[in-house]
Amino acid sequence: MRVGIIGCSGRMGTLLSNLLRATARFTLGPGFSRTSTHSLASVIDNNDVLVDFSSSSLSEELFRALLSNPKPLIFATTKPAPSSSIDEKIEDLAAYVPVVVCPNTSLGAYVQKRLAALLAAVFDDAYDIRITEVHHRGKKDAISGTANELVSILCDAKKKEWQQEYRVGADSDSVKNIELHASRVGNISGEHEIAFISDKEQITLRHTVFSREVFAEGVLRILDWLLNESPPPGCYGPEVGLKVSV
């Protein structure tokens, strides 16, 4: 299986390239970056599967090109703003090929999301919710894709279990707010913290990444799943490569 990386010259693209070179079951194909000599169309044409580690500014262009020449995609970058049409384009592409949407491919992040949904269903409106995410100063997007995903998970759980609307940055009395903070400092690979806080107690879920290799290894697990399972077209999450049922 020939793997092409979109964003091949970035931190994650470089890490994944090195990991792929060390494996016998995958071949590193031509990649794309803003400074590469390959066009986006030629990279898509000359690979069996694509991994996107670029940025949200490229997403619209990438999906337009993929809809002209569908290839399986691991979409591992932050989605553009909700006003974009990316969700619709993901669904369109997933009608033809497998699309794995995973802004965070680590096992710890997946478990944190599942626990967050559980706690959101347990704690009522007496508990305020705060999300804090910290990354290295070179990370361009804020809020991170993982933090945005956590917000969606919490809002869905609150609406389902408590019939209560939650959102970020709302000022209506009928809407509960999720406090959300982002920081870009130093060389921190990634930290996400969710706190449920009442007048009497607090419970906190924190996931900290010490090495970016954990993300590249997560992508490799998803590639193994694509290679071994040959899944049908559809939209999938990062759990497909984790072999977990929690």
From Swiss-Prot:
Q: Which residues form the active site?
A: H135 (proton donor/acceptor), K139 (proton donor)
Detail which positions bind NAD(+). Answer: G7, C8, S9, G10, R11, M12, A76, T77, T78, C102, P103, N104, T105
List the GO cellular component terms: cytosol
**Record InterPro entries:** DapB_C, DapB_N, DapB_N_CS, DHDPR_bac, NAD(P)-bd_dom_sf
In its UniProt record, which GO terms are filed under biological process?
A: diaminopimelate biosynthetic process; lysine biosynthetic process via diaminopimelate
Q: Which reaction does it catalyse?
A: (S)-2,3,4,5-tetrahydrodipicolinate + NAD(+) + H2O = (2S,4S)-4-hydroxy-2,3,4,5-tetrahydrodipicolinate + NADH + H(+); (S)-2,3,4,5-tetrahydrodipicolinate + NADP(+) + H2O = (2S,4S)-4-hydroxy-2,3,4,5-tetrahydrodipicolinate + NADPH + H(+)
Q: Which Pfam families match?
A: DapB_C (PF05173), DapB_N (PF01113)
Q: Which CDD domains match?
A: DHDPR_N
Cite the binding residues for NADP(+).
R34
* Subcellular location(s) of the protein: Cytoplasm
Provide this UniProt record's keywords sorted from A to Z: Amino-acid biosynthesis, Cytoplasm, Diaminopimelate biosynthesis, Lysine biosynthesis, NAD, NADP, Oxidoreductase
Gene Ontology molecular function: any one:
4-hydroxy-tetrahydrodipicolinate reductase
Annotated positions binding (S)-2,3,4,5-tetrahydrodipicolinate: H136, G145, T146
Q: What is its EC number?
A: 1.17.1.8
**Pathway(s) annotated for this protein in UniProt:** Amino-acid biosynthesis; L-lysine biosynthesis via DAP pathway; (S)-tetrahydrodipicolinate from L-aspartate: step 4/4
Tell me its family.
Belongs to the DapB family.
Say what the protein does.
Catalyzes the conversion of 4-hydroxy-tetrahydrodipicolinate (HTPA) to tetrahydrodipicolinate.
Annotated protein name in UniProt: 4-hydroxy-tetrahydrodipicolinate reductase
| Biological classification of the source | Bacteria, Pseudomonadati, Chlamydiota, Chlamydiia, Chlamydiales
